[in-house]
Amino acid sequence: TTSVFYNELGKAERICYPNGSSTVYEYEKGGRLKSVRYPDGAGEHYGYDAKGNLTERTTTAGENYRYNYDSLDRMISVQNPAGGISYFTYDALGRVIKAENESGNQTCYEYTPNGNLAKVTDAMGNETFYQYDAMGHLTQSSCTGAEGEEPQNTVYTWDKEGHVTAVTDPLGDVECYTYDPAGRMKAKIDKDGYETSFHYGKDGQVEEIRYADGRTVSLTYNAIRQLEEVRDWLGTTKIAMDEAGHIASVTDPYGKTVGYEWGSMGERTAICYPHGR
Protein backbone atom coordinates (compact mmCIF):
# COMPACT_ATOMS: atom_id res chain seq x y z
CA THR A 1 0.00 0.00 0.00
CA THR A 2 1.18 3.50 -0.87
CA SER A 3 -0.08 6.05 1.67
CA VAL A 4 -0.34 9.82 1.31
CA PHE A 5 -0.41 12.18 4.31
CA TYR A 6 -1.63 15.76 4.11
CA ASN A 7 -1.14 18.94 6.12
CA GLU A 8 -3.84 21.28 7.44
CA LEU A 9 -4.11 22.99 4.04
CA GLY A 10 -4.81 19.72 2.26
CA LYS A 11 -1.40 19.60 0.61
CA ALA A 12 0.54 16.33 0.45
CA GLU A 13 3.43 16.41 2.92
CA ARG A 14 4.56 12.78 2.79
CA ILE A 15 4.09 9.81 0.48
CA CYS A 16 5.06 6.48 2.01
CA TYR A 17 5.81 3.55 -0.28
CA PRO A 18 5.46 -0.19 0.42
CA ASN A 19 9.25 -0.62 0.68
CA GLY A 20 9.41 1.85 3.58
CA SER A 21 10.81 4.77 1.60
CA SER A 22 9.07 8.11 1.32
CA THR A 23 8.88 11.42 -0.52
CA VAL A 24 8.62 14.47 1.75
CA TYR A 25 7.21 17.89 0.82
CA GLU A 26 7.94 21.07 2.78
CA TYR A 27 5.93 24.28 2.44
CA GLU A 28 6.28 27.92 3.37
CA LYS A 29 3.75 29.51 5.73
CA GLY A 30 1.73 30.77 2.78
CA GLY A 31 1.41 27.27 1.38
CA ARG A 32 3.98 27.58 -1.39
CA LEU A 33 6.12 24.52 -2.02
CA LYS A 34 9.58 25.03 -0.48
CA SER A 35 11.29 21.70 -1.07
CA VAL A 36 10.83 18.07 -2.08
CA ARG A 37 13.01 15.24 -0.79
CA TYR A 38 12.86 11.99 -2.73
CA PRO A 39 13.52 8.44 -1.45
CA ASP A 40 17.08 8.45 -2.77
CA GLY A 41 17.90 11.54 -0.71
CA ALA A 42 17.96 13.92 -3.65
CA GLY A 43 15.85 17.02 -3.39
CA GLU A 44 14.46 20.07 -5.15
CA HIS A 45 14.23 23.55 -3.64
CA TYR A 46 12.13 26.58 -4.56
CA GLY A 47 12.35 30.30 -3.74
CA TYR A 48 9.78 33.08 -4.18
CA ASP A 49 9.55 36.85 -4.08
CA ALA A 50 7.18 38.84 -1.87
CA LYS A 51 4.41 38.52 -4.48
CA GLY A 52 4.68 34.76 -4.63
CA ASN A 53 6.42 34.56 -7.99
CA LEU A 54 8.87 31.69 -8.37
CA THR A 55 12.36 33.25 -8.42
CA GLU A 56 14.64 30.27 -7.90
CA ARG A 57 14.56 26.53 -8.47
CA THR A 58 17.30 24.05 -7.62
CA THR A 59 16.98 20.62 -9.22
CA THR A 60 17.94 17.23 -7.80
CA ALA A 61 21.21 17.54 -9.72
CA GLY A 62 22.02 20.79 -7.94
CA GLU A 63 21.35 22.90 -11.01
CA ASN A 64 20.01 26.35 -10.28
CA TYR A 65 17.50 28.34 -12.34
CA ARG A 66 16.62 31.97 -11.61
CA TYR A 67 13.49 33.82 -12.74
CA ASN A 68 12.94 37.59 -12.94
CA TYR A 69 9.70 39.55 -13.30
CA ASP A 70 8.64 43.05 -14.21
CA SER A 71 6.38 45.31 -12.12
CA LEU A 72 3.33 43.56 -13.61
CA ASP A 73 4.57 40.14 -12.46
CA ARG A 74 5.35 39.01 -15.99
CA MET A 75 8.37 36.77 -16.34
CA ILE A 76 11.00 38.71 -18.27
CA SER A 77 14.06 36.48 -17.97
CA VAL A 78 15.24 33.01 -16.99
CA GLN A 79 18.85 32.23 -16.13
CA ASN A 80 19.94 28.64 -16.60
CA PRO A 81 22.62 26.79 -14.58
CA ALA A 82 25.31 27.70 -17.11
CA GLY A 83 24.55 31.40 -16.74
CA GLY A 84 22.75 31.74 -20.05
CA ILE A 85 19.72 34.00 -19.98
CA SER A 86 16.47 33.85 -21.94
CA TYR A 87 14.39 37.03 -22.28
CA PHE A 88 10.69 37.69 -22.86
CA THR A 89 9.12 40.91 -24.17
CA TYR A 90 5.43 41.80 -23.91
CA ASP A 91 3.05 44.24 -25.55
CA ALA A 92 0.72 46.61 -23.71
CA LEU A 93 -1.88 43.85 -23.39
CA GLY A 94 0.52 41.45 -21.69
CA ARG A 95 1.05 39.17 -24.68
CA VAL A 96 4.48 37.79 -25.49
CA ILE A 97 5.79 39.47 -28.65
CA LYS A 98 9.40 38.28 -28.50
CA ALA A 99 11.24 35.39 -26.87
CA GLU A 100 15.03 35.28 -27.01
CA ASN A 101 16.96 32.23 -25.85
CA GLU A 102 20.39 32.12 -24.23
CA SER A 103 22.03 31.92 -27.68
CA GLY A 104 20.36 35.10 -28.85
CA ASN A 105 17.92 33.34 -31.17
CA GLN A 106 14.60 35.14 -31.29
CA THR A 107 11.02 34.06 -31.91
CA CYS A 108 8.55 36.88 -32.57
CA TYR A 109 4.77 36.86 -32.22
CA GLU A 110 2.14 39.10 -33.80
CA TYR A 111 -1.57 39.27 -33.03
CA THR A 112 -4.80 40.26 -34.77
CA PRO A 113 -6.87 43.23 -33.52
CA ASN A 114 -9.10 40.65 -31.83
CA GLY A 115 -6.18 39.20 -29.90
CA ASN A 116 -5.72 35.99 -31.86
CA LEU A 117 -2.22 34.87 -32.78
CA ALA A 118 -1.59 36.08 -36.34
CA LYS A 119 2.05 35.31 -37.08
CA VAL A 120 5.06 33.54 -35.58
CA THR A 121 8.57 34.11 -36.92
CA ASP A 122 11.26 31.76 -35.63
CA ALA A 123 15.00 32.29 -35.39
CA MET A 124 15.55 30.79 -38.86
CA GLY A 125 13.14 33.24 -40.44
CA ASN A 126 10.41 30.66 -40.94
CA GLU A 127 7.01 32.27 -40.70
CA THR A 128 3.70 30.73 -39.69
CA PHE A 129 0.54 32.70 -40.42
CA TYR A 130 -2.87 32.10 -38.85
CA GLN A 131 -6.24 33.05 -40.33
CA TYR A 132 -9.61 33.16 -38.58
CA ASP A 133 -13.24 33.53 -39.54
CA ALA A 134 -15.60 36.21 -38.25
CA MET A 135 -16.34 34.08 -35.18
CA GLY A 136 -12.68 33.77 -34.25
CA HIS A 137 -12.32 30.16 -35.37
CA LEU A 138 -8.93 29.19 -36.79
CA THR A 139 -9.45 28.48 -40.49
CA GLN A 140 -5.90 28.11 -41.78
CA SER A 141 -2.30 27.94 -40.63
CA SER A 142 0.41 28.46 -43.24
CA CYS A 143 4.07 27.73 -42.61
CA THR A 144 6.67 29.17 -44.96
CA GLY A 145 10.18 27.76 -45.10
CA ALA A 146 13.04 28.55 -47.45
CA GLU A 147 12.46 31.00 -50.28
CA GLY A 148 10.80 29.30 -53.23
CA GLU A 149 9.22 26.53 -51.18
CA GLU A 150 5.48 26.09 -51.23
CA PRO A 151 3.80 27.09 -47.95
CA GLN A 152 2.57 24.23 -45.81
CA ASN A 153 -1.12 24.87 -45.22
CA THR A 154 -3.46 23.24 -42.74
CA VAL A 155 -7.11 24.15 -43.30
CA TYR A 156 -9.93 23.91 -40.75
CA THR A 157 -13.60 23.82 -41.76
CA TRP A 158 -16.36 24.72 -39.29
CA ASP A 159 -20.12 24.40 -39.31
CA LYS A 160 -22.46 27.20 -38.27
CA GLU A 161 -22.72 25.75 -34.75
CA GLY A 162 -18.98 26.14 -34.21
CA HIS A 163 -17.90 22.53 -34.65
CA VAL A 164 -14.82 21.51 -36.63
CA THR A 165 -16.10 19.41 -39.54
CA ALA A 166 -12.85 18.84 -41.43
CA VAL A 167 -9.10 19.28 -41.09
CA THR A 168 -7.00 19.20 -44.25
CA ASP A 169 -3.26 18.75 -43.71
CA PRO A 170 -0.45 20.09 -45.94
CA LEU A 171 -0.48 16.86 -47.98
CA GLY A 172 -4.14 17.30 -48.80
CA ASP A 173 -5.29 14.48 -46.53
CA VAL A 174 -8.60 15.18 -44.84
CA GLU A 175 -10.07 14.05 -41.52
CA CYS A 176 -13.79 14.70 -41.19
CA TYR A 177 -16.15 14.95 -38.23
CA THR A 178 -19.93 14.79 -38.01
CA TYR A 179 -22.22 15.75 -35.15
CA ASP A 180 -25.73 14.95 -34.02
CA PRO A 181 -28.41 17.64 -33.43
CA ALA A 182 -27.25 17.93 -29.81
CA GLY A 183 -23.75 18.89 -30.93
CA ARG A 184 -22.14 15.61 -29.91
CA MET A 185 -19.56 14.04 -32.18
CA LYS A 186 -21.28 11.29 -34.16
CA ALA A 187 -18.42 10.06 -36.31
CA LYS A 188 -14.80 10.65 -37.21
CA ILE A 189 -13.51 9.63 -40.63
CA ASP A 190 -9.73 9.58 -40.96
CA LYS A 191 -7.68 10.33 -44.07
CA ASP A 192 -7.86 6.68 -45.16
CA GLY A 193 -11.63 6.62 -44.97
CA TYR A 194 -11.86 4.60 -41.76
CA GLU A 195 -14.80 5.63 -39.62
CA THR A 196 -15.10 5.65 -35.84
CA SER A 197 -18.67 6.21 -34.66
CA PHE A 198 -20.01 7.26 -31.27
CA HIS A 199 -23.41 6.21 -29.94
CA TYR A 200 -25.18 7.86 -27.03
CA GLY A 201 -27.82 6.85 -24.53
CA LYS A 202 -30.94 8.79 -23.61
CA ASP A 203 -29.01 10.68 -20.95
CA GLY A 204 -26.43 11.87 -23.46
CA GLN A 205 -23.50 9.74 -22.36
CA VAL A 206 -21.43 7.67 -24.77
CA GLU A 207 -22.62 4.07 -24.61
CA GLU A 208 -20.74 2.55 -27.52
CA ILE A 209 -17.78 3.32 -29.75
CA ARG A 210 -17.52 1.39 -33.01
CA TYR A 211 -14.30 1.16 -35.00
CA ALA A 212 -13.88 0.55 -38.71
CA ASP A 213 -12.46 -2.95 -38.16
CA GLY A 214 -15.63 -4.02 -36.36
CA ARG A 215 -14.27 -3.76 -32.83
CA THR A 216 -16.45 -2.03 -30.28
CA VAL A 217 -16.19 -0.49 -26.83
CA SER A 218 -19.28 -0.49 -24.61
CA LEU A 219 -19.62 1.76 -21.59
CA THR A 220 -22.04 1.30 -18.71
CA TYR A 221 -22.94 3.87 -16.08
CA ASN A 222 -24.63 3.71 -12.70
CA ALA A 223 -27.79 5.56 -11.68
CA ILE A 224 -25.89 8.77 -11.00
CA ARG A 225 -24.07 8.77 -14.35
CA GLN A 226 -20.74 7.47 -13.10
CA LEU A 227 -18.82 5.10 -15.37
CA GLU A 228 -18.85 1.62 -13.85
CA GLU A 229 -17.96 -0.79 -16.65
CA VAL A 230 -15.99 -0.75 -19.91
CA ARG A 231 -16.21 -3.73 -22.26
CA ASP A 232 -13.84 -3.99 -25.19
CA TRP A 233 -11.99 -6.67 -27.19
CA LEU A 234 -9.70 -7.33 -24.22
CA GLY A 235 -12.52 -8.01 -21.80
CA THR A 236 -14.32 -6.07 -19.07
CA THR A 237 -12.91 -3.39 -16.79
CA LYS A 238 -15.01 -2.67 -13.72
CA ILE A 239 -14.95 0.57 -11.74
CA ALA A 240 -16.38 0.70 -8.21
CA MET A 241 -17.24 4.00 -6.55
CA ASP A 242 -17.59 4.81 -2.87
CA GLU A 243 -20.50 6.74 -1.35
CA ALA A 244 -18.66 10.04 -1.73
CA GLY A 245 -18.24 9.53 -5.46
CA HIS A 246 -14.57 8.61 -5.41
CA ILE A 247 -13.14 5.66 -7.32
CA ALA A 248 -12.82 2.85 -4.79
CA SER A 249 -11.33 0.25 -7.10
CA VAL A 250 -10.59 -0.61 -10.71
CA THR A 251 -10.54 -4.25 -11.81
CA ASP A 252 -8.99 -5.00 -15.20
CA PRO A 253 -10.03 -7.77 -17.63
CA TYR A 254 -7.51 -10.12 -16.01
CA GLY A 255 -9.07 -9.80 -12.58
CA LYS A 256 -6.35 -7.60 -11.09
CA THR A 257 -7.67 -4.87 -8.82
CA VAL A 258 -6.20 -1.54 -7.77
CA GLY A 259 -7.90 -0.02 -4.72
CA TYR A 260 -8.03 3.60 -3.59
CA GLU A 261 -8.63 5.10 -0.16
CA TRP A 262 -9.75 8.67 0.47
CA GLY A 263 -9.68 11.10 3.36
CA SER A 264 -12.50 13.23 4.75
CA MET A 265 -11.49 16.20 2.56
CA GLY A 266 -11.54 14.16 -0.63
CA GLU A 267 -7.80 13.65 -0.73
CA ARG A 268 -6.41 10.31 -1.83
CA THR A 269 -4.69 8.66 1.13
CA ALA A 270 -3.67 5.26 -0.20
CA ILE A 271 -3.33 3.12 -3.30
CA CYS A 272 -3.52 -0.65 -2.92
CA TYR A 273 -1.96 -2.55 -5.81
CA PRO A 274 -2.55 -6.21 -6.71
CA HIS A 275 -0.59 -8.58 -4.45
CA GLY A 276 0.17 -5.62 -2.16
CA ARG A 277 2.66 -4.07 -4.55
Regions found by a protein language model. Give the residues of each.
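Beta-strand elements of repeat-based all-beta scaffolds
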Residues: 1-17, 21-38, 42-59, 63-80, ...
